[in-house]
């Protein structure tokens, strides 16, 4: 039995977000094929995701120097507890399903803030004399990525820092990232929206059976 963490990184409701619609198709098929697995849904825009800021970095250094957690300011304790809870939730999962849009050739800022809660030296990777070593080698992920243009291939593929960035950072910590599902090109061809979404849903169903 596997534990799946379904991470939604769009503020848009499902009826508006095409990538979320495709992700729901993926999850429905996955649950049907793997009824004994547990699925936990994390909606980032409905979740307190603390920014890795000066306050958190200072608290981390103070704790490493021997300061007691209870000696931190109450608001810092609260922020650190929320941060650590996201870290532990991520580490406890076996599989990850990310659904996220491309914003200005990158990922949503809240998704970047979330990434910072689990890409942590000593937790998901460690430094060695030979360089960084991944620690999450027995886990897998799939990325479901939406964009108005087409960036998965062709002349604009070098412009994007969305799907390639998330794939790279997950691979850096050892996670096996299977082929992504792209929901793209609708802004270029609005008349083909239904066709594009249907094709992506078909890929999602097939991918779910193998995930």
From Swiss-Prot:
Q: Which cofactor does it need?
A: FMN
| Family annotation (HAMAP family) | Azoreductase_type1
Per UniProt, the keywords (alphabetical) are: Flavoprotein, FMN, NAD, Oxidoreductase
Q: Name one GO molecular function term.
A: electron transfer activity
What reactions does this protein catalyze? 2 a quinone + NADH + H(+) = 2 a 1,4-benzosemiquinone + NAD(+); N,N-dimethyl-1,4-phenylenediamine + anthranilate + 2 NAD(+) = 2-(4-dimethylaminophenyl)diazenylbenzoate + 2 NADH + 2 H(+)
- What EC number(s) are associated with this protein in UniProt? 1.6.5.-, 1.7.1.17
On cofactor binding, the record's note says: Binds 1 FMN per subunit.
First-level EC class: oxidoreductase
Q: Which Gene3D superfamilies match?
A: 3.40.50.360
Subunit field text: Homodimer.
Write down what this protein is called: FMN-dependent NADH:quinone oxidoreductase 2
General function of this protein? Quinone reductase that provides resistance to thiol-specific stress caused by electrophilic quinones.
Protein's UniProt keywords contain Flavoprotein: yes
What residues bind FMN, as annotated?
10, 17-19
List the InterPro entries: Flavodoxin_fold, Flavoprotein-like_sf, FMN-dep_NADH:Q_OxRdtase_AzoR1, NADH:quinone_OxRdtase_FMN_depd
Q: What is the species of this protein?
A: Listeria monocytogenes serovar 1/2a (strain ATCC BAA-679 / EGD-e)
Q: Name one Pfam family in it.
A: Flavodoxin_2
Protein family: Belongs to the azoreductase type 1 family.
């Amino acid at each position: 039995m596997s534990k799946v963490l379904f991470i939604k990184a769009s503020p848009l409701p499902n009826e508006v977000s095409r990538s979320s619609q495709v992700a729901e198709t993926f999850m429905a098929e996955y649950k049907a094929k793997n009824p004994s697995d547990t699925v936990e849904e994390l909606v980032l825009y409905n979740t307190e995701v603390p920014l890795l800021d000066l306050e958190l970095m200072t608290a981390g250094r103070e704790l490493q120097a021997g300061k007691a957690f209870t000696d931190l300011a109450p608001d810092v304790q609260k922020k650190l507890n929320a941060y650590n809870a996201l870290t532990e939730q991520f580490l406890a999962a076996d599989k990850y399903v990310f659904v996220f849009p491309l914003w200005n050739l990158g990922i949503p800022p809240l998704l970047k803030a979330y990434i910072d809660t689990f890409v942590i030296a000593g937790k998901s990777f460690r430094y060695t004399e030979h360089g960084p070593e991944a620690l999450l080698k027995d886990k897998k992920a799939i990325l479901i990525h939406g964009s108005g243009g087409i960036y998965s291939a062709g002349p604009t593929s070098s412009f994007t820092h969305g799907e390639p960035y998330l794939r790279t950072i997950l691979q850096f910590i050892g996670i096996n990232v299977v082929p992504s599902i792209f929901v793209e090109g609708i802004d270029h061809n609005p008349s083909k929206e239904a066709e594009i979404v249907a094709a992506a849903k078909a890929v999602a169903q097939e991918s779910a059976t193998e995930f």
